[in-house]
């Protein structure tokens, strides 16, 4: 009895876990244990088609299931027109010109193009098949800044500036419709270009705010003392020493953590300074009169200075300018923090 049941019941394989049914059992297990066809193939072949029934193309369901779609395409192509071109692809038309052909009989796939035949190009297409670039019409403002000489082929005016080198000056002067003569417009054009180039060369200031009052009085006192000592030539320290001991004045002792470096160019002094009342390094310009009676201080904002500038200030060394008007000894007041720290990254 057990042997009979085992011959009729399906057996599960050990590796692939698929159901194995004997052919003479007559048991249908999940569509006969065969692989199901994907949805894309089901939509193409149909759901009610029999496996053993042949298709119109001469293929059965088993052939379609095995993936023989190339043979199906070949069969459809044979039904349409043998080994001809693919269905749905338009054929290219060859251009026929009776002047160039000797026999004068165009073929079936020829498009007659000649002196008697006219071909209409729609949607702004040219004879070469490319879309023409449509330019806007010229205005008076355009003629004042452009060449405007008409082209001998198309008749379109030249869109190059007034300094166009393709056309002569006489042809540019002959263009009508300008507000001013060509020479006046050309001079204005050159002046505008030169003015723009000059403005681009001028360096912009780091800031426009000037600190001249209030808490900046201490900074003024230090800058004035440094300047007068440098132009007087009376210094208590050697010239090769780059440090300056501040006076015993309590007002100047507050500047112990002040970093200054002076670069003397004629009568203009540029000072990089860090003071307790300034958040970061600031660039200060000091200008004096001939007698040295008046000191003008212009302090620029600190946030505009790059980080590498602060690192270079710790090892800044100055040289005496013997050719300057006031060639006195220059001293630099330096601090031990925080700018001599190599890990300092700036403002």
Swiss-Prot record:
Cross-referenced InterPro entries: SCA7_dom, SGF73
Annotated ranges, domain SCA7: 134-201
UniProt-annotated stretches for the region Disordered: 77-106
Superkingdom to which the source organism belongs: Eukaryota
Gene Ontology annotations for the cellular component aspect, listed alphabetically: SAGA complex
Keywords: Signal
Signal peptide: 1-13
Protein name (database record): SCA7 domain-containing protein SELMODRAFT_439258
Record-linked Pfam families: SCA7
Keyword Signal in record: yes
Coiled coil: none
The keyword Signal appears for this protein: yes
